[in-house]
Every structure is written in structure tokens, then in C-alpha cells.
């Protein structure tokens, strides 16, 4: 077995995704999800050696109990896995302006993650808990913990992309600017697209679409991010599962002044009750929207708004390509599986020369990659993302 095994941790506010990955060949030795933290049904599901398992963590359990279970129960059955761990990689949603690349975790890095809490109030505190618990659970790897920032890939954006047209003092004194998210995914598919196009990565011009429960589009010019749809927080941009994406900011004043909603109520509505859920009034699940597009008005409405917004971003970002767009890339749970989303979106972009191939499009689902456009059309590709592999590779490289 390889000795480049990395434990990858992705701590959310109420969940913890984990995996043990070989940073050299990408092989996954363990993967799982602990979820429903702080609730009676807190549980852990995992897959090891091809077999699936599930266990209750106990009422009210959270990150600490989950990591304890991973170390003392799951890994205790395979001590050779623990023994071969060389590093721990942590996904960090927001690194502010401080981090332009992944970093070995020390006091300064921890402070930087704390400083960015206002921009990711749900995620960054959970990441800090995950780091603290990992240091406790794996004392031998104390200096081998690496933070991989979702914002890092976007730090190459020029000022005209990241500044808002607000008083400049808000940026100068309070760091209010566009940061973006999903950077690790956009980075990964950019590398993979360059291989598929047989070009050096610094020569590719792409528009990458990471579409999942959260979604963002990134303009990649000469291999670097020059603009992205998420903003100061992950609320800006596309229609998402429960997030509104772009709205007229004055809607907030209207909701407050005319409808008597509190700031907390408005925040909750925009982040947890909008997007596909808000438009369907039924669900945030894109599969419902696809399955019922022809038969239900709520599904059609949601799908049409979703694809309209996505097509607008792709069209806008084509203006940043210096006259050469190599491909549009679809990734993420929706981007990889929702053939209808891709077809309806690309059908709006005939001006850019996209012609979808229906058979290819329906074949490129469920983990399969490839071109979904006709020969002679401008290229659109499906590339399944692998953020965990990037995190494992960065952790391995920085601690070697």
C-alpha cells in the first residue's frame, strides 16, 4: 500500500464529510458522512472495503463524537490505515484576502480563518471545531494539518471583478469585496479540461459551472480565475437549492419596511427558503424539477428561472475571454447529472455557437465525463469534480 494516505475533513455546521485518500493514485480507502448533529438522530454512514455501514452517534452528538467514532471504532478495525496517514486536509470555505493558496495550519492560519468568520458564519466556526478535534484525535499529525481554501483559486481576480460599486472605504477598511466559492472544484475541472483539450493549463479559456445545492460560475482566462458569480458570501449569483442568488438589494428594504420582516427572517428566507425551494414551494431538489418539468407548473417555473440565470452568466463571462472560449464545463451534482439543465441552458446560447448532442448529453451522467455538444459545435464538457482529491494532494505536497 502507498504511504501517501491523507484524511480529508469537510466540517459543516451540522455535518462532517470524511475520506481517506491516496494522494498519489486517487484511490479512496474510506469515505463517509456524519450528519444530523445536535439532533436526536445524529448518525454516521461510511463505506470501507466496498461495504456500507451505518451507526447512531447518540442524541445531540456533534463533531467531537463523530471524530471519536471514526478514530476509535472505524479506524480501530484497520489500524494499518491510521498508521499510514501522512497528513490531514481540511476544506475551508472562506479564507478572506489573506490566503491565495493552501497552507499548513499554525496559529496564524487559525487566526486568518477566525477573521473570515463574518463572511462564512455557518462554515468557518465548524471548520475551526474540526481542526481542534483533529489535533486532539491525531496528535502525531499535529504539524501535518493543511487548510485548503474554497476562496483561494479566485484570488487572481482583477480589481474590476472583485470590487463592488460601494464606497471604497468599505473595501479598504472592512474587506467588503467579491471572494467567490467552490474554488477547489473550479481549479480541479480547469486542470482536467486542459488535459482533455491537450493544452497547457495556462493557455485554456473556460467558463466552469459548478452546480450543486450551491452553485457558481467562474470565468477562467489563461488558466486563472478572472471573475466568479458568488460574492462576499455564497449567496450571490445563480439560483441555488435554497438560496436566491442575485436579487435587487432594495427587495430587502421592501420586505423590512412594507412587510414587517425582521433582518433575521429576511436572512433565513434568502439563504434557506428561496432558490428552487422558493420557486417550486415544494423542494430544493433539482431531480423533482427535471422529472416534473413537462407536467407541473411549479417545476417548469423553477427550471426556467434556473437555466435563464445560468445562461446569462455564461453569456456575460464570454465577454471576458479575449475572443477565445475553448469550452464550457459542467460539474457538481446537478452539473454532472441533470441533462435537462445543460440542454435548456446551452439551447439559449446559440449565438456562442453551442449545439447540444442529445445522445451525448444523456450519456454523460452518473459519473461519466465527456463532450455533450455536436462535432463542429463550440465545445461543452461534463467533468465530474473531485474536491477531496485536490485537498489530499495539497495536504500531501505541503507536508512532504
Swiss-Prot record:
Annotated residues for binding of Mg(2+): 10, 387
Membrane-traversing stretches: none
Gene3D superfamilies in the cross-refs: 3.30.420.40
UniProt KW keywords: ATP-binding, Cytoplasm, Kinase, Magnesium, Metal-binding, Nucleotide-binding, Transferase
Signal peptide annotation: none
InterPro entries in the cross-refs: Ac/propionate_kinase (IPR004372), Aliphatic_acid_kin_short-chain (IPR000890), Aliphatic_acid_kinase_CS (IPR023865), ATPase_NBD (IPR043129)
GO BP term (any one): acetate metabolic process
Binding site for ATP: 17, 210-214, 285-287, 333-337
Catalytic activity entry: acetate + ATP = acetyl phosphate + ADP
EC number: 2.7.2.1
Record note on cofactor: Mg(2+). Can also accept Mn(2+).
Protein origin, superkingdom: Bacteria
Cofactor: Mg(2+); Mn(2+)
Top-level EC class as recorded in UniProt: transferase
Active site: 150
SUBUNIT field: Homodimer.
Purpose: Catalyzes the formation of acetyl phosphate from acetate and ATP. Can also catalyze the reverse reaction.
HAMAP family per the UniProt record, alphabetical: Acetate_kinase
Name the UniProt record assigns to this protein: Acetate kinase
Lineage, uppermost ranks: Bacteria, Pseudomonadati, Pseudomonadota, Gammaproteobacteria, Enterobacterales
Gene: ackA
Amino acid at each position: 500500500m502507498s504511504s501517501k494516505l491523507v484524511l480529508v475533513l469537510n466540517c459543516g455546521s451540522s455535518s462532517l464529510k470524511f475520506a481517506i485518500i491516496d494522494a498519489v493514485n486517487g484511490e479512496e480507502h474510506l469515505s463517509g458522512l456524519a450528519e444530523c448533529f445536535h439532533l436526536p438522530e445524529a448518525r454516521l454512514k461510511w463505506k470501507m472495503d466496498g461495504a456500507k455501514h451505518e451507526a447512531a452517534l447518540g442524541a445531540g452528538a456533534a463533531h467531537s463524537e463523530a471524530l471519536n467514532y471514526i478514530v476509535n471504532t472505524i479506524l480501530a478495525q484497520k489500524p494499518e490505515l491510521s498508521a499510514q496517514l501522512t497528513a490531514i486536509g481540511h476544506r475551508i470555505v472562506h479564507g478572506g484576502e489573506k490566503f491565495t493558496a493552501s497552507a499548513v495550519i499554525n496559529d496564524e492560519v487559525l487566526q486568518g480563518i477566525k477573521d473570515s468568520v463574518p463572511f462564512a458564519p455557518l462554515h468557518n466556526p465548524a471548520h475551526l471545531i474540526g481542526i481542534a478535534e483533529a489535533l486532539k484525535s491525531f496528535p502525531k499529525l499535529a504539524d501535518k494539518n493543511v487548510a485548503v481554501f474554497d476562496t483561494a483559486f479566485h484570488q487572481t481576480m482583477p480589481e474590476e471583478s472583485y470590487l463592488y460599486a460601494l464606497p471604497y472605504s468599505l473595501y479598504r477598511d472592512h474587506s467588503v469585496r467579491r471572494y467567490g466559492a467552490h474554488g477547489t472544484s473550479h481549479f480541479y475541472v480547469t486542470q482536467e479540461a486542459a488535459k482533455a483539450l491537450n493544452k497547457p493549463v495556462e493557455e485554456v479559456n473556460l467558463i466552469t459551472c459548478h452546480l450543486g445545492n450551491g452553485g457558481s460560475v467562474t470565468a477562467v482566462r489563461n488558466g486563472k480565475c478572472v471573475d466568479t458569480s458568488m460574492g462576499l458570501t455564497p449567496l450571490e449569483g445563480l439560483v441555488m437549492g435554497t438560496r436566491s442568488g442575485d436579487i435587487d438589494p432594495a427587495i430587502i428594504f421592501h420586505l423590512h419596511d412594507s412587510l414587517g420582516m425582521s433582518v433575521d427572517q429576511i436572512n433565513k428566507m434568502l439563504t434557506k427558503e428561496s432558490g428552487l425551494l422558493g420557486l417550486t414551494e415544494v423542494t430544493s431538489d433539482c431531480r423533482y424539477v427535471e422529472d416534473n418539468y413537462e407536467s407541473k407548473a411549479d417545476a417548469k417555473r423553477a427550471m426556467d428561472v434556473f437555466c435563464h440565470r445560468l445562461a446569462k452568466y455564461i453569456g456575460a463571462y464570454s465577454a471576458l475571454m479575449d475572443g477565445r472560449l475553448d469550452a464550457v464545463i459542467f460539474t457538481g451534482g446537478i452539473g454532472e447529472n441533470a441533462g435537462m439543465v445543460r440542454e435548456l441552458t446551452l439551447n439559449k446560447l446559440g449565438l456562442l455557437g453551442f449545439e447540444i448532442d442529445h445522445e451525448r448529453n444523456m450519456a454523460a451522467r452518473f459519473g461519466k465525463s465527456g463532450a455533450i455538444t455536436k462535432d463542429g459545435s463550440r465545445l461543452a464538457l461534463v467533468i465530474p469534480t473531485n474536491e477531496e482529491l485536490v485537498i489530499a494532494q495539497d495536504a500531501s505536497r505541503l507536508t512532504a
